[in-house]
Structures are given as C-alpha cells and as structure tokens.
C-alpha cells in the first residue's frame, strides 16, 4: 500500500507495480495515485519507460546525465508507465539500476507494465543486475 496517499504526513516511501493487459486501467490508476500525491503536496513525475530511456540516452550524449539523474532523484513520486514494452540494451539496463537505486528508501516509484513481474528478470537480461533492480520496485 502507498501510505503517502492516505497519510501524507508519514515519511514512508512505498513503491508499487501494476501489471495487466492493454486497456485494463494501469495508466489511469498510476495517474490517479500521482494526482493524489500532488494534492498531498508531493512532486510527481510521469514518464513512459521508452521516453525515459530515450531522454537518458540523450543526456549521456550531451553530458547532462548526472544532473538529470539528480533531478529525478528529487521527485517524490516517479511514475514509470509501460515498463518492458520495448527491448532495452546494456546502457538502459544500467540507467534503470541507477535510477531505482537512487530512490530506494528515500522516494516512491510506481511502475506499470503489460509484462508480468515474474518475467521482468528475463526482460532485464543481465543476471548480475536483474535481482537488485526488480527487488527494489
């Protein structure tokens, strides 16, 4: 449960994932949670996973990756929509690990995906990194 929805004064940072088929309301639910977080005075960022990885790739190219990562780390609730909808490479895998690792215990994350959670390990692909990233969501 995301306690910041019910008790915004609690300094607890919960994460949640929602997986189901297209059109089942995952994005609607994630955005509703984000909207409530905004009403409770929290900063929220909604981003589709493919766009996030594209943006971070551009940040690598222009040298602003660390700055962007720091900015995302300050967001109270990060909503990553459509996770695992497109293949990722080693760079995206590392970016995901850094992004999630920066948020553990200090900020909340909501992830939506059509891919069941038990298949995320295969999607992420690198056996040295797949456990920490998915365990923290």
Predicted regions and their residues:
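Phosphate-binding P-loop
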Residues: 6-13
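Walker B motif beta-strand of ABC-family P-loop ATPases
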Residues: 77
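Conserved beta-strand position immediately N-terminal to the Walker
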Residues: 16
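Hydrophobic helix-cap positions at the C-terminus of alpha-helices
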Residues: 7, 36-37, 102-103
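N-terminal pre-Walker A segment at the start of P-loop NTPase domains
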Residues: 1-5
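Walker A/P-loop
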Residues: 19-42
């Amino acid at each position: 449960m995301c306690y910041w929805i019910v008790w915004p004064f609690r300094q607890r940072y919960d994460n949640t994932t929602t997986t189901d088929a297209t059109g089942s309301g995952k994005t609607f639910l994630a955005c509703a949670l984000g909207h409530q977080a905004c009403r409770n005075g929290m900063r929220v960022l909604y981003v589709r996973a493919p766009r996030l990885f594209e943006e971070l790739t551009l940040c690598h190219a222009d040298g602003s990756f660390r700055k962007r990562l720091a900015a995302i780390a300050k967001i109270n609730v990060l909503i990553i929509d459509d996770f695992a909808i497109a293949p990722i490479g080693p760079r995206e895998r590392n970016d995901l690990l850094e992004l999630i690792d920066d948020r553990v215990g200090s900020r909340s994350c909501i992830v939506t995906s059509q891919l069941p959670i038990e298949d995320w390990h295969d999607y992420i692909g690198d056996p040295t990194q797949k456990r920490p990233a998915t365990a923290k969501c």
